[in-house]
Amino acid sequence: MEVLYSLSKTLKDARDKIVEGTLYSNVSDLIQQFNQMIVTMNGNNFQTGGIGNLPVRNWTFDFGLLGTTLLNLDANYVENARTTIEYFIDFIDNVCMDEMARESQRNGVAPQSEALRKLAGIKFKRINFDNSSEYIENWNLQNRRQRTGFVFHKPNIFPYSASFTLNRSQPMHDNLMGTMWLNAGSEIQVAGFDYSCAINAPANIQQFEHIVQLRRALTTATITLLPDAERFSFPRVINSADGATTWFFNPVILRPNNVEVEFLLNGQIINTYQARFGTIIARNFDTIRLLFQLMRPPNMTPAVNALFPQAQPFQHHATVGLTLRIESAVCESVLADANETLLANVTAVRQEYAIPVGPVFPPGMNWTELITNYSPSREDNLQRVFTVASIRSMLIK
């Protein structure tokens, strides 16, 4: 994997910097590195593809070295270099696609394709190593079963979940109380509602709770907490739990009271915030617990009082909500990230070449299914294919 990254980094630099008119002295070190790559690769043969519709291709390396010059690089020099660069880039692209198409239930973090396994051989250690990539660094650690640490922005840590729980219900569905939520990606939105606006609750206060367990622990997370859940702020028709009927939800938004958010790790509270909105920090957690209240307003203007009558029918439904959004966090496991294209790149390659469903990844690389059942085998394979995708993205956009 390190060799693949070093090859890609060298090729990217060569493609960007070996251009007509450049002083040789400005790129002499790069050209020496490029020549070392050629010397190491010459005489070797590789094969890629042969899975799904990814065609089998054979690769032979027999290239001349780039020479020295006292002046600027001329058109012939650059054209000669370009021919070599383009062949190498095509090779790297196919090695990456071959690797992204494969998976293994055992030791899935290790190279799976024939070509990448061959590049891991001792003879290729002479290629200049550049391990500055976060993914390469963490792949090395994971490969040695040591602690990794990926920094994600907008991590897709929450499997998609949209549902409701009714704490008070009746066949007519005309006086309901409960919670509804939408968890997806890096965001939780939860709303507590009471058709009667807590008129019969103790002290006219309804208490709500929403607990979300993460599939992997996060550390040093920057989080935004808002006293609103905009996705539940407009009328809607909702299917009943048994699917036998539908019920009408017509929210009127109130501000939540006594809001508390707890971040827990292995059942122990690590951080707690009360009535604090905006940016908050969570040190280490695998569970989020949200507590909030709906309080019937003690004083109401006639217009507000008309919204919340003392008895049925209740045409407007008192609702309070919260939004919790993870802006950035560190995770020991690799995750999809809304700010990265790695999952999209891997999925696109597997779809384009009709890669058959294997023993590890779900059909279509369904992220909700993948993260819901995030096994060690999936984690290993995902770290490998994301590392390869990050390498490929240097050369192929």
Swiss-Prot record:
Zn(2+) binds at H153. GO terms for cellular component: viral envelope; viral intermediate capsid. Residues 62-73 are annotated as: Interaction with the inner capsid protein VP2. Keywords: Calcium, Capsid protein, Intermediate capsid protein, Metal-binding, Ubl conjugation, Virion, Zinc. The keyword Zinc applies. One of its GO terms (molecular function) is metal ion binding. One of its GO terms (biological process) is fusion of virus membrane with host plasma membrane. The N-terminus is blocked. Sumoylated with SUMO1 and SUMO2. Sumoylation of viral proteins seems to have a positive role on viral replication. The keyword Calcium applies. Its main location: virion. Ca(2+) binds at N266, D286. It is found in: Virion. The VP6 trimer contains a zinc ion located at the center of the molecule. The zinc ion is not essential for either trimerization or transcription activity of the DLP. Zinc-depleted VP6 has an increased sensitivity to proteases. Homotrimer. Interacts with the inner capsid protein VP2. Interacts with the outer capsid glycoprotein VP7. Interacts with the outer capsid protein VP5*. Intermediate capsid protein that self assembles to form an icosahedral capsid with a T=13 symmetry, which consists of 230 trimers of VP6, with channels at each of its five-fold vertices. This capsid constitutes the middle concentric layer of the viral mature particle. The innermost VP2 capsid and the intermediate VP6 capsid remain intact following cell entry to protect the dsRNA from degradation and to prevent unfavorable antiviral responses in the host cell during all the replication cycle of the virus. HAMAP family: Rota_VP6 (MF_04126), Rota_VP6_A (MF_04129). Belongs to the rotavirus VP6 family. This is Intermediate capsid protein VP6. It comes from Rotavirus A (strain RVA/Human/United States/D/1974/G1P1A[8]) (RV-A).
